Amino acid sequence: MRFQSFPRLLGLLLTVLLSTGCGAPPTPSAPRTAVPPPSATQQPVAPTSGYPAPATAPAGGTTLDTALSTPASAPGAAGCRSQGAPVSPYRVVATYPHDPTAYTEGLLYLGADTLYEGTGDWQNSLLREVTLSSGQIKREVKLREVAPPQPGAQANFGEGVAVVGDRIFQLTWQSGFGLIYDRASFTVLKRFTYPPAGIALPVEGWGLSYDGTRLIMSDGTAKLYFIDPEATFNTGVLALTGQVEVRDTGVPITQLNELEYVKGAIYANLWNCDLIARIDPATGAVQTYLDLSGLRTLLPITPNVTPEVLNGIAYDATGDRLLVTGKWWPSLFEIALPVARTYLPLALVAPPPPLTPLHWS
């Protein structure tokens, strides 16, 4: 007696087993609860299956692989809390050194392990280029040197920064103007002024980002302003093209600060909060929040430095990494967000090929 179709039968059995065990989505699990950061004596918490696998930190960075999650009702710093939009979990992937004297107002990732950072402070506002992995400052310019104040006037306070092609735009807080630098040399090409104060116009400069077409600006209110960068450069006046009010379930969300455009959404720091709001640029609706107040427990103690509010968001589109830090923070964190999972319905799974009749002899 000889069995001629054993390989085909074995393939059929494997197909049946796999389709019955893996074809359907899992049942919903209970809501996640807050997971505290690891202490010095605890091992890091293993990541949940909803996150991408942790990356290996480059030289100078430390892989933390710490799972952190916050329930939707939990407050952030200074009693901040969601009005109704959900709070997303996140995971700390790595930590990098950050200048604890930097009063961070703007943060950008340019690739090649390089950050651009704009800082505030009346006497120490800067635009600088920094190596992410080491925190080393490659070059910098001081606002008080490239844009000295008028005699008797207060110094200029630097704010958000954005890169548009070979130019860098930087805002000032209350001086009524911004600067446009040549990206290669860090020399000032031009100043641009804010329009006269009005009900629909930005009065102060806070956060700045670029969506590939428009600059996006915040002024500490609930408004986001859309700006034509080329017209701004050509005219020397902020060229406003539109605006949107940011709301969470109908409630205006004020004090929008540093901004970053990420995958079609605007991520905004909220001043005096350790929250980041994810905003739909078309409607202004807050889609989700990140409550990053737990990052404070991971900051090393630095003599003579008291970390202030979370501020600074940079996105690495190539590596799909989100980088965050704060004012006078000695660390910068790479965080990962949950990955949406999809499942193939059983009806779409290709049926096995028809069986060949068995031949016995």
Indicate where each model-derived feature is located.
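Conserved beta-strand positions in repeat-built beta-propeller and related beta-rich domains
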Residues: 115-122, 163, 168-175, 215-221, ...
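Conserved beta-strand position repeated across blades of beta-propeller domains
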Residues: 108, 162, 207-209, 260, ...
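Signature of short aromatic-glycine-proline-rich micro-motifs recurring in repeat-based ectodomains
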Residues: 104, 158, 256, 303-314
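Surface loop/turn motifs at the tips and blade-to-blade linkers of beta-strand repeat domains
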Residues: 95-100, 141-153, 191-201, 244-251, ...
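Ser/Thr-rich, Proline-interspersed low-complexity disordered segments
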Residues: 13, 22-87, 342-360
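A short helix->beta-strand "capping" segment at the edge of beta-propeller domains
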Residues: 79-101, 134-135
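Short coil/turn segments that connect the beta-strands within blades of beta-propeller domains
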Residues: 112-113, 165-166, 212-213, 263-264, ...
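Beta-strand-rich domains and repeat architectures in extracellular enzymes and scaffolds
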Residues: 93-126, 146-147, 152-162, 326-330
